[in-house]
Amino acid sequence: MNPSKLSSLLLTLSLIFISQASCALYEEVCKAAAEESARCLQVLKDQPRIALAKNDMELSKLVVEFALKKGTEAQNYLKEMMKTNPAPAIKDCATTHYDGVVGSFRSSLGELKSDTETANYDAKAAGDGAETCDVALAKAKINIPAISALNKEIKLISKIAFLATDRLPEQ
C-alpha cells in the first residue's frame, strides 16, 4: 500500500473512532437532569477535573467534593450577610439550614466507597437545606435575589451530586 493510501485509511479510521467517541461522563449526568440539563452543563463545564473523570466513582467523588466546596462557600456568604442583615430567617439559613447542606455533602463524600446508597441519599438531602432556607425567607417576607440565586444553585448542585452518585453500584 502506498503512503498516501495508508494516510487516507488512517485518517478515515481516526474520524470514525472520533465520531463514535462517547460523551464525557458529566454530560451523561447532565442529560439525566432533564429540564435542568443546560444549567448542569454550565455549572460543570468549567470544572476540568470533573470533565475528565474516567469512571463513575471518580466522577462522583469530584462532583461531591465540588458540591461540598460550593455549599461551604454559600454558607460563608450567608454568615457574612448575617453581619449586615441580622434577620432571624437569614441567621437560620446561614446556620441551621446550611449546616445541613454542608453536613450532608460531607457525609455523602465520606460514604462514597463504603455505602453508595447512603452517599446518594445524602447528596440529595443536601438540597433540602437550601429549599428550607427559601421557605424561611418567604415566610419572613425577605426577598434577596442573591440568596435566592445561591439556593437555586445549591439545589441544582445537590441534584447533580445525586445523579452522579446514583450511577454507582450498590455495595
Enumerate the predicted regions with their spans.
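Folded extracytoplasmic luminal domains of secretory or organellar precursors
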Residues: 20-171
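Terminal membrane/secretory targeting segments in land-plant proteins
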Residues: 1-25
